[in-house]
């Protein structure tokens, strides 16, 4: 917890948001949430790890819900072992959506279970996150965190980078 508090102090001095990884304790998920404020990001928000899953403890779920409503941004941060279908499905069914969807892609997660951002997006669709919210969570939402202006990004003469997806129902 001391490291998280120190990080928060530095983030305040630099006037930047802080991003914190939650998973195995220490620090506990609730302790991290209590330190974060509006604009800060907690990643691995839907992990299923013992002692750190928002679905293990109703108080922790309520705290995550309250913090999200106050501006703490929940990020998927899938990674190699930090995404639980069960937790994501239950949280989304209760109305708690992630602010952003990220892969946490690294050498141990690239070939399984993350694969790529499109696969991670598909996982969120499969557990009930609405399509428009999924698209926002990989475009405007993360851009907002780093204060990237998204106005007129697709306009005549502007440099654009986009992907076209084919949405297919499947198991």
Can you name each region flagged by the protein language model?
Residues 169-171:
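Short, Lys/Arg- and Gly-enriched loop/turn segments at beta-strand edges
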Residues 86-165:
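His/Asp/Glu-enriched, well-ordered alpha-helical/loop segment
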Residues 1-111:
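Active-site core of metal-dependent hydrolases
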């Amino acid at each position: 917890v001391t490291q998280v508090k120190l990080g928060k102090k530095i983030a305040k001095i630099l006037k930047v948001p802080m991003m914190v990884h939650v998973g195995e304790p220490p620090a506990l998920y609730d302790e991290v949430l209590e330190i974060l404020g509006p604009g800060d990001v907690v990643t691995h928000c839907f992990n299923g790890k013992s002692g750190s899953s928002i679905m293990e403890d109703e108080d922790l779920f309520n705290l995550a819900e309250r913090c999200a409503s106050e501006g703490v941004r929940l990020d998927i941060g899938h990674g190699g072992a930090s995404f639980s279908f069960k937790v994501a499905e239950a949280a989304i069914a209760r109305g708690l959506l992630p602010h952003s969807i990220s892969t946490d892609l690294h050498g141990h997660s690239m070939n399984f279970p993350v694969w790529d951002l499109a696969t991670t997006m598909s996982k969120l669709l499969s557990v009930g996150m609405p399509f428009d919210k999924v698209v926002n969570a990989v475009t405007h939402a993360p851009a907002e965190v780093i204060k990237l202006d998204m106005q007129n990004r697709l306009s005549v003469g502007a440099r654009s980078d986009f992907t076209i997806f084919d949405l297919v129902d499947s198991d």
